[in-house]
């Protein structure tokens, strides 16, 4: 330590002068200086130990005194009531009240004259405390104090922090009369109840007749109710049954559901239709992404109607004709933002509507064709006839085994390559199912044909005829919640 910190300049460092001065005075002896302070304490251990024990023994409550000197939140009436109720015979002398308060609350161990005077005032001025004379047999002085029997409930819920009201003797008869009035009405109604029951049977029978007729008059409901006999016993037994069947079987509860599904021209939206679409898809070409979309997206389908996709997919068709491949990809990307919420409506399209849509080769020119384009982009309707119809603008007469078309210009593919870099990872997201390859495609047709032909174990068809670069690195069951790329997001979350 002396080598590092020089003794000549003790003010060189802010913390060191104390150490350097110590070393300066101890420089003559090596470490003998350390033994002398230890000897001071070790030579007289009994003196300090005994002194500490004796000094703290009589004042064992003093360390907690600063915390306990806060005045308790109880009134003097509450303190007196506590003392009386804790007494064995529910009566206690004035000195007993003082002792109880001092034992329970250290705050009252000081200034005894002030608070004890307040205790005496409260005992004499409040009518809830009754003075009981002392028996001559028991030694001692001072009378006992007890609580008036009618004042036991003067505190709310047994809490001494709040009193209901000031107890007065003249209020006791009024309270007793009120209690008597409260007890009488149940007995009178119980006596009058048997006389009123035959009168009440008539309305119950009428209600039962109305319920049975309304259920039978609705032809669209398959609910069959059992008609009971209209005897008083039968009416009483059948009324719970009819009351419980009205929410489920009456036209008020179930007909609005059918009418709500009717304006869209779609079948009733339910879990059964989704499960049947998932288990038996049309044509058997439903890709895993589409099957997953049918299960993930449905809660978002209810607030939207079937008409809005036509308004959003018209710009997609114009971008397809005007801007070529790059504009088409961008517009399809933008359209996936709008059609992400309406998608389940396309998943539930009935087969009759599919056939009607497949007869119109115009594609996005009509609203129905635009609706089907959005459904085809989703990948839920994966038949080959539909996807040929969607891309009629690029290949009007393309047979299924199409030869390799001329490749698109390089700038277009480079500009759109950042959409397609993580295609294999994006294939599990419903909004980006069209970008399924990790390499850039030579043309737009292969990019949109490859993912619709079933990516599991089925043949890839046209997309593999063209070149060997279309070997899809598709994972069989990608996890639903995996984040694929920094720019990817799931439209169903918003």
Curated annotation (Swiss-Prot):
<keyword id="KW-0597">Phosphoprotein</keyword>
<feature type="region of interest" description="Disordered">
    <location>
        <begin position="233"/>
        <end position="267"/>
    </location>
</feature>
<dbReference type="GO" id="GO:0072011">
    <property type="term" value="P:glomerular endothelium development"/>
</dbReference>
<dbReference type="Pfam" id="PF00250">
    <property type="entry name" value="Forkhead"/>
</dbReference>
<dbReference type="GO" id="GO:0003007">
    <property type="term" value="P:heart morphogenesis"/>
</dbReference>
<dbReference type="GO" id="GO:0048701">
    <property type="term" value="P:embryonic cranial skeleton morphogenesis"/>
</dbReference>
<feature type="compositionally biased region" description="Basic and acidic residues">
    <location>
        <begin position="170"/>
        <end position="184"/>
    </location>
</feature>
<dbReference type="GO" id="GO:0007219">
    <property type="term" value="P:Notch signaling pathway"/>
</dbReference>
<dbReference type="GO" id="GO:0072144">
    <property type="term" value="P:glomerular mesangial cell development"/>
</dbReference>
<keyword id="KW-0805">Transcription regulation</keyword>
<dbReference type="GO" id="GO:0008286">
    <property type="term" value="P:insulin receptor signaling pathway"/>
</dbReference>
<dbReference type="GO" id="GO:0001974">
    <property type="term" value="P:blood vessel remodeling"/>
</dbReference>
<dbReference type="GO" id="GO:0000976">
    <property type="term" value="F:transcription cis-regulatory region binding"/>
</dbReference>
<dbReference type="GO" id="GO:0001945">
    <property type="term" value="P:lymph vessel development"/>
</dbReference>
<dbReference type="GO" id="GO:0003677">
    <property type="term" value="F:DNA binding"/>
</dbReference>
<dbReference type="InterPro" id="IPR018122">
    <property type="entry name" value="TF_fork_head_CS_1"/>
</dbReference>
<dbReference type="InterPro" id="IPR001766">
    <property type="entry name" value="Fork_head_dom"/>
</dbReference>
<feature type="cross-link" description="Glycyl lysine isopeptide (Lys-Gly) (interchain with G-Cter in SUMO2)">
    <location>
        <position position="183"/>
    </location>
</feature>
<dbReference type="GO" id="GO:0001568">
    <property type="term" value="P:blood vessel development"/>
</dbReference>
<dbReference type="GO" id="GO:0001822">
    <property type="term" value="P:kidney development"/>
</dbReference>
<dbReference type="GO" id="GO:0003700">
    <property type="term" value="F:DNA-binding transcription factor activity"/>
</dbReference>
<feature type="modified residue" description="Phosphoserine">
    <location>
        <position position="287"/>
    </location>
</feature>
<dbReference type="GO" id="GO:0001503">
    <property type="term" value="P:ossification"/>
</dbReference>
<keyword id="KW-0238">DNA-binding</keyword>
<dbReference type="GO" id="GO:0001569">
    <property type="term" value="P:branching involved in blood vessel morphogenesis"/>
</dbReference>
<dbReference type="GO" id="GO:0035470">
    <property type="term" value="P:positive regulation of vascular wound healing"/>
</dbReference>
<feature type="compositionally biased region" description="Basic residues">
    <location>
        <begin position="385"/>
        <end position="394"/>
    </location>
</feature>
<dbReference type="GO" id="GO:0048704">
    <property type="term" value="P:embryonic skeletal system morphogenesis"/>
</dbReference>
<dbReference type="GO" id="GO:0072112">
    <property type="term" value="P:podocyte differentiation"/>
</dbReference>
<feature type="modified residue" description="Phosphoserine">
    <location>
        <position position="218"/>
    </location>
</feature>
<feature type="compositionally biased region" description="Polar residues">
    <location>
        <begin position="239"/>
        <end position="248"/>
    </location>
</feature>
<dbReference type="GO" id="GO:0097746">
    <property type="term" value="P:blood vessel diameter maintenance"/>
</dbReference>
<dbReference type="GO" id="GO:0043565">
    <property type="term" value="F:sequence-specific DNA binding"/>
</dbReference>
<dbReference type="GO" id="GO:0120163">
    <property type="term" value="P:negative regulation of cold-induced thermogenesis"/>
</dbReference>
<dbReference type="GO" id="GO:0055010">
    <property type="term" value="P:ventricular cardiac muscle tissue morphogenesis"/>
</dbReference>
<dbReference type="GO" id="GO:0033625">
    <property type="term" value="P:positive regulation of integrin activation"/>
</dbReference>
<keyword id="KW-0832">Ubl conjugation</keyword>
<dbReference type="GO" id="GO:0009725">
    <property type="term" value="P:response to hormone"/>
</dbReference>
<dbReference type="GO" id="GO:1902257">
    <property type="term" value="P:negative regulation of apoptotic process involved in outflow tract morphogenesis"/>
</dbReference>
<feature type="modified residue" description="Omega-N-methylarginine">
    <location>
        <position position="292"/>
    </location>
</feature>
<dbReference type="GO" id="GO:0016604">
    <property type="term" value="C:nuclear body"/>
</dbReference>
<feature type="modified residue" description="Phosphoserine">
    <location>
        <position position="250"/>
    </location>
</feature>
């Amino acid at each position: 330590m002396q080598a590092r910190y020089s003794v000549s300049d003790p003010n060189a460092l802010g913390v060191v002068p104390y150490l350097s001065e110590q070393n300066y005075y101890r420089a003559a002896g090596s470490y003998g200086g350390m033994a002398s302070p230890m000897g001071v304490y070790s030579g007289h251990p009994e003196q300090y130990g005994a002194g500490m024990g004796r000094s703290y023994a009589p004042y064992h409550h003093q360390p907690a005194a600063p915390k306990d000197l806060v005045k308790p939140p109880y009134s003097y009436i509450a303190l007196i009531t506590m003392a009386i109720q804790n007494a064995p015979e529910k009566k206690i002398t004035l000195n007993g009240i003082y002792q109880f308060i001092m034992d329970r609350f250290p705050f009252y161990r000081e200034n005894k004259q002030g608070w004890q005077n307040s205790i005496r005032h409260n005992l004499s001025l409040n009518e809830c405390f009754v003075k009981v004379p002392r028996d001559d047999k028991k030694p001692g002085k001072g009378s006992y104090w007890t609580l008036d029997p009618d004042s036991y409930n003067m505190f709310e819920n047994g809490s001494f922090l709040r009193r209901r009201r000031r107890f007065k003797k003249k209020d006791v008869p009024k309270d007793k009369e009120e209690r008597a009035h409260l007890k009488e009405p149940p007995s009178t109604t119980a006596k009058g109840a048997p006389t009123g029951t035959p009168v009440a049977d008539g309305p119950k029978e009428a209600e039962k007749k109305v319920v049975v007729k309304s259920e039978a008059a609705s032809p669209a409901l398959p609910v069959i109710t059992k008609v009971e006999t209209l005897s008083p016993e039968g009416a009483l037994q059948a009324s719970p049954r009819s009351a419980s069947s009205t929410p489920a079987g009456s036209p008020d509860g179930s007909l609005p559901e059918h009418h709500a599904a009717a304006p869209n021209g779609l079948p009733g939206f339910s879990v059964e239709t989704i499960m049947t679409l998932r288990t038996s898809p049309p044509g058997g070409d439903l890709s895993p992404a589409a099957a997953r979309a049918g299960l993930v997206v449905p809660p978002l389908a209810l607030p939207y109607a079937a008409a809005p996709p036509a308004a959003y997919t018209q710009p997609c068709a114009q971008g397809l004709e005007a801007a070529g491949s790059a504009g088409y990809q961008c517009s399809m990307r933008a359209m996936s933002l709008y059609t992400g919420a309406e998608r389940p409506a396309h998943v539930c399209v009935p087969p009759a509507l599919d056939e009607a849509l497949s007869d119109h080769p115009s594609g996005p020119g009509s609203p129905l064709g635009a609706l089907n384009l959005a459904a085809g982009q989703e990948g839920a309707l994966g038949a080959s006839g539909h996807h040929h119809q969607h891309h009629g603008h690029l290949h009007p007469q393309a047979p299924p085994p199409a030869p390799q078309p001329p490749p698109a210009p390089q700038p277009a593919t480079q500009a759109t390559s950042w959409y397609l870099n993580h295609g294999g990872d994006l294939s599990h997201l419903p909004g980006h199912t069209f970008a399924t390859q990790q390499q850039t495609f030579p043309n737009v047709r292969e990019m949109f044909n490859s993912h619709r032909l079933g990516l599991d174990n089925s043949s890839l068809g046209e997309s593999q005829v063209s070149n060997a670069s279309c070997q899809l690195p598709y994972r069989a069951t990608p996890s639903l919640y995996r984040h694929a790329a920094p720019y990817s997001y799931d439209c169903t979350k918003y």
